[in-house]
Amino acid sequence: MTQPTVPTVRGDAWCRSDIDRFVLATQEALSITSTVALPIDADATSLMRRASFDLRGLPPSEAEIKAFAADPSDANFAAFVDRSLASEAFGERWGRHWLDLARYAETLAHEFDYDIPSAWRYREYVIDALNRDVPPARFVAEHLAGDLLEPRASMGLANAAPLATAWWFLGPATHAPVDVRQDEADRIAGAVDVVGRSLFGLSIACARCHDHKFDPIPARDFYAIAGVARNTRRVEGFIDTDARAATLANDARAALNNASIALGVAPQLHALDASIVTRIDDATDGGRAWSRAGHAFDASTALLALNDDGSLVLAESGTIDSARLDAQLVGSARSPAFPLTKRFLHLRVRGRESWIRTIIDNYWLDDRNGLLFEGMRRELPAPDASYAASDPRAYPWRIETFDMQRFIGERAYVELIDDRGGWIELDAIMESDESTASAVETWDVDGIASALELTTPLSEPIRVRAVGARDALRACSPPIRALVAEDSGAFDEPVHMRGSSRNYGELAPRAQLSILSAASTHAVALDGSGRLALAQSITDPATPYLWRTLANRVWLKLFGRGIAETPDDFGQLGAAPWSTELLDHLALKLARGATLKQLIREVVLTRAYRSAAGSTELPSSAWQPLPVRRLDAESIRDAMLVASGTLDASTGGRSVPVHLSEHMQGRGRPGASGPVDGASRRSVYLEVRRNFLDPFMQAFDQPLPSTTCGRRHASNVPAQSLALLNSELVHLLAARWGEQLSSGAQREMSDDARIDSMWYAAFARAPRTDERREAREFLTLERGARTDATADATADATTDASAQDSAAFTALAHALFCAKEFVFLR
């Protein structure tokens, strides 16, 4: 990209910024006369309501409306914009835009709609990152490789960046695939499609079966990213909530290593190891190639172990052990991926209240599919009383054998999970063609045990240091569990001929997209999965694709129409930008370090944004003033909560369970329904279940969470009017609004005062004289109807009058909810 020259325009006095000059230049270029009709400014009410919904997803308050009406200056509007950008509501509003791109949902769909573990933490991450105005390059890099970047503390976590990597795994998935390898290929294709559309604005997934027919994307480019995804595995990791935990774990491990050096035990153990064959360290470098989460396995390669009472004992070399530092710690460890070459896989393990599983082709739903993956998950239960209080190193070893006959030739890895206060130790992994492996059974376990007696006294300061670090680590707040990504290998994926996962062609080097490498100013070094290299390529300021895509998305969300009208497809089949110069002008701001909030602020303060909706009609090759826009589903629901005075503005936390009507039936239906009003939380905090989507939100075009959606449909259909007329939610919120207006101090207000407050809440303006008169007449009719209906009742007169008042205002509230002005922006 090169910086475009800011155009000189005849109507320069109309412009407030260079953005306005680019906009006006497109109009003047179409004019055959020396003048062009300049867009008129929006009135104060329309502008405030527009900016409030665009920036916060909520209507402005009556106080904000009146303050701006009294002083509609540029400075006052800029101050309102700054307050909106600084509010928590900004992240909730713009976070929902990003969740559309991420195909965010909390279940997997298919037949039983199983949960995606802790998916809500990804939503929390997005909202927090946008509120903190994390630079776009860092934000995107965290999505691709947050676990491989320098830590970024936030949300009460020592490192929030890994939470973003759940993005890779938020798509729908099959829980009982006939072909596991094909299922993995399909899941990867979905992830690649999201990478392409959300970050490049290109349909890379079209190159899965053949070279792209229209864009310069060969099939090897698709498999370059597919290789990255296949070397990336989905795990439920542990993330520290205490920034000291990692340092304390390192201190404790160093203390154990120093103790072993002081005792001179390392040579003895290495000599012992030489007599033992097919140990885990033969295949995986003493467990150092294993990936770990949490701190339970941090000291698993130490030669000494720390007992609960503070004593030190010799530990076996070459095992993976979660109890060497402290049996109270939680964590998990995963082996590198390896090909299955024989029928049986043997693991020698011991422990209690923990479990072990074997993952085939990154298929993590083994616990959901007993037919296909029966026996791939094993639990180590609590032992009998004779072992319960003893040293973990006295626990008996056991052989766990997995039958892999159906999966020979596939890739697998072993996962150890210690998350319930127990512990687990793995001594060996071995393959054989026999169900019982003689090599495993004949290991000299007794010889090992006798050789590990600790007889040399240890210096007290060394022991105290180890115990002190262990105890300090115990005192840290526990980590959270979260869905994250990690590297599982470093191999290139072959091109799948015609998209077949069983018919391979040439290898496609990971992360080296031709369109990126051609524009990049530096070479990208591949390492591990290639995710970090991919992140570096995409966020390179010299490559225009990400920056143009993001700039276009910002313009789309603020103007209802992008500079390029197809935000997810900048290719040959997409619409050309009406101003490539303006697009590059905005994209370069992001590439050179501008944050999302900074760009949004600059655009919102332009004269173009402040123009009246639909004030001119020009060809598609020029800027179009804002159209009259319908609010999206979330804003309609949130606006009703605000109007009724019941919005719970608290932020964060687990999702509110979806409300299930009697018509929402099917397999996978949750056992309990959520509240009708979603606990009065903002819509972004409502649970998104793929098989049980909220009917009200669907009526107003909330997208299906199947793939990237950069531009929602904006339909105007009878079903929407029917939803507003008949929805249980709308009736409930109208009743709450009516009750609020007919109780407490508001009951003492005049009808006109209450009518005025309703108009401000619904439409951000005072009612006109004719509207106020009609509203009074409506209330009189409703009260009369209520009086007639209760004429024979014997209720207390005061109570009955209050009920009549509440019913009348409820009916008026419902009428305002159904008004076009309530659900549309000008």
Residue ranges and their predicted role:
Residues 363-410, 417-425:
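Extracellular carbohydrate recognition and processing domains
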Residues 317-343, 354-357, 397-401, 534-537:
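Short beta-strands within extracellular/lumenal beta-sheet-rich domains
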Residues 149, 157-251, 693, 697, ...:
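Sequence context surrounding c-type heme c attachment/ligation sites in exported
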Residues 1-6, 96, 107, 129-187, ...:
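Post-cleavage N-terminal segment of exported redox proteins
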Residues 185, 316-331, 391-393, 524-528:
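Extracellular beta-rich ligand/substrate-recognition surface
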